Structures are given as C-alpha cells and as structure tokens.
Amino acid sequence: VTFPQSLRGPFLFGAVLGLLVFTLYASVAFSGVAAWMIGLIYIAYDTLLLGFMVVSSQVAVNRQARRRALPPSPRTGPRPTVTLLVCARNERLVLPECLRALAAQTEPADEIIVLDDGSTDGTADWLVAEYAMTFEPTGTARIGRSAAWPALRIFSKPNSGKADSLNHGWRLARGEVVITLDADTVMVPGAVAAIRDGFADDPRLGIAGGVLVPICQRTASAGFFQFFQTFEYARGFLWRQVFAQYDMLVLISGAFAAYRRSVLESAGGFDVDSWVEDYELTHRIYQKSFDAGRPVTVKIIADAQGTTDAPARVTSFLNQRRRWFAGFIATHFKYHDMVANDRYGRVGRYMMCIKTLDLLLPVYALAAAVVLIMLLSIRHWLPLFIIKVIIIKLLYDLFLHAYSIFLYQRWQGIPLSRKLWLQSIGATLTEPFVFQILRQLGAVFGWLAFLRRSIDWQPQRPVATAEPMYDSPSS
C-alpha cells in the first residue's frame, strides 16, 4: 500500500509535533534521564546533522580546490548578458556604496536598474543629481536614464513592496541573466564576472547565489551581533555549498541572487504575497521545472562575494528572524506536496523532509533549555549523564565549528587566520547561551506571526536624515 503523497508532509509534521508533545509530558511525568528526553533528542539530531555537514563540506572544499588548481579553459561560446536589479526603499545612505562597487566590476553588468520603491528619503533626487538622470513618465511610475552612466537606469514608482518592484524590474530587463541585489549589498570587483561564468558553464543552471559577509551598523550592540553573525553566515553559506553539491539547495539569499531570465519568466516571477519572495520562488522554480521534465540546478558561486547589512539591534534582529521564519513556514506548507516526493529528486526525497523537521527544531531547542532550567530550579537535580552529554556536545561543537571555519576560509580562498579560529572557539562556547536563544525566540515569534497571518515589515536602519549611522563596508 502506497502512502498518499498529499498526506506525507502533514503526517511527518504531525509525527514531529506529537513527539514534541510527548517529550514535554515526559519532563513532568518521568524522573531520571527520561525527564530531559526533549534535550537528548535535540542534541542527537543536531550532532548527526553537524557531523554530516562538516564531512560533506570537506568534500565540497576539496572539489573547489581541484577546480581552482586547473588551468582556465578557453570559453568559445557566447557568454550571457546580465541585468542587475538594485532594490531600494529609503536607501539613500547605502546606495552610493553599492553603485560604486558596481562601477568597479571587472566585467560590469550590461544593464543596471535601480528599483526605487516609493522612497521618501530623496533616493531618486540623489540619483538624478549624481548620474544626470532624465525621466520618461509611465503612468504612476517613471523610468530614468543616465547620461553619465549609459548602463544605469532607474524605475521609480509608488511603494508596492519588494516582490512587486522585482517583477517590474525583470520584465524591463534585457539581460539573459537577472541579478537581484539589495541596496545595502556591496559586491567585490569580480562578482558579476563569476556569476556570468557560472551561467555560461552550466546551461541547466537556473538560480545562483553569491556569498555574503554581514556588516553591522555602529550601535551599542553592533559588536555582539557582528561577532555571532559573522560565524553564522560563514557556516550557513558553506552548508549551502554542501546542499548544492547534492542537488538539493533551496535557500538563496535575495540580497544577492541570480536567475536565468527564461526560468524566471516560466515561473511567473516573484510572489507579491510572500514574506520571503526569494525562498518561495526557488521552490516554485524547482516544482515547475521538475513537472516540465527539465529540472534546473541551483548553485552557490563561491567567487561571487559581497558584504551586506545585518541587524545590529535586538529588536531589528528579532523582527528579521520572525519574518524569515514565518515565511519559511508558509512556503513549506504551500509546497507540502513536494515532501518525500521522488518526483522532485533529492529536493523532494530529502531536503523537504529535513525542512519539515526544521519547522519545529527551534521549539525543541528552546523547550529543552526551559526544561533543563526547570529541573535545576524546581527539582534541584540533574543526572550526571545529562551533564556529561552537555559537556561532550560542547566539545564536539567546539572542534567541528572551528574546523568548519578552516574549511570556509579554504573555500573562499581567504588566507588562514589564527585570530578567526580563536574567535570561532569563543563563539562556539557562548553561542548556545546567548545568540542561539535569540535565534530560537525569533523562530517562535515567526510561528506566532504565521498563525496570526500577520507580519509587518520593519526597516533595519532608520530612514536617512543626514549622516550615515554605520561603518561603510569595504569590498
């Protein structure tokens, strides 16, 4: 008897939810080690996953090193044209740095369109003055062209959201490859060339992502968030390379993403109702391409690098993670038919199952911490076995996290840094007690936002008034 495909996703989620309820019951009904069953289950899953990711990262980095060691092969075929879309709403302070980086590219984009989504901080006026823009009125929107930089255009319209702005942008685009870029993302000089090479080398490549390093504004808590997010991003992008080598990558950062225009058009563009339009689009492209019998590949391009603004305050961090997780939940439930579905290759067979577990993983982690505190404060008791497990897990994480930073540096071609290794040790030892709790809280808030079907977008930075409030990232 074949289990109905439409029920596989809900059944797996129900099983994970049922286990959560049972382990919470065990924390009050049982004694001994069984009282912290929820923590042991979480640690077991996290241990297996981390081990798999680090071993697989070693394989991915070795492959990358072998490719870099080979002499470059001559390219005889045509290379794709590139349109770069820069999304901007009240980004007057960061847009100049972004555009300077685009002008400094070793292989500039054939076309750059700044999508001004109803900015009220003078973004459009600054572009007009800085780049000698002249406008052609188009209904309520305006299209401007630069006399100083022929490749640069601006599409200025009333505020309608990022997804709608991107849809206007790619429909205006003339390039065969469309790169989407946030206005606070600063590319390294070879980033566009790396994207162009990636699409030229792989005709099946439908979506590609760059590698980003977070830069935090200058605030009282900036050092804290810069420290932890640096290692979070490094591991996260390395893990994406792992999933890409197994043909099951579903997460590409919209702050620096690239799409083959024909694939984007076939999928119908970005969903204006999604809280995470980039993540939702990747799922839809996978679904449509597999259904059509022409599955695309999704990759991370290691040499397409850049920096991006990251939250530097507790409130902005929690707002960001709440929106991300609420969007993740909504997207996963929307495409639940892909869960455990061989029709969608390894994405359906494995990745969608992993993501089903991830829906409740932060709840498991936070509940495990609460139960542990309860055992200590109410029962004044903790089995020696649990203490040993926690210590062993910290040592395990310490070694593998430090080694993953070594692998990340090799993968990115960064000179090996002893200082970074030592910092990674400090991050590993302290992250579970501070930063990880903030991440899990953001995910729980995401669940609440999803259940209420309501979430407000909040800017990470104050709207520009005069002087920048952050350290400009260097490319």
Set out the residue ranges of the language-model regions.
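Acidic donor-binding segment of Leloir-type glycosyltransferases
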Residues: 100-158
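Long helical/loop segments within the catalytic core of UDP-sugar-dependent glycosyltransferases
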Residues: 59, 136-167, 171, 175, ...
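A short, conserved alpha-helix in the catalytic core of glycosyltransferases
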Residues: 263-266, 274-299
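N-terminal signal-anchor transmembrane helix
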Residues: 41-44, 49-109
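Active-site donor/metal-binding and catalytic loop motifs
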Residues: 296-316
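Short aromatic/hydrophobic "clamp" motif used to bind/position activated sugar donors
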Residues: 178
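Membrane-embedded multi-pass helical conduit in multi-pass membrane proteins
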Residues: 24-60, 74, 355-451
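Cell-envelope/extracellular polymer assembly enzymes that use nucleotide-activated donors
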Residues: 80-83, 111, 265, 280
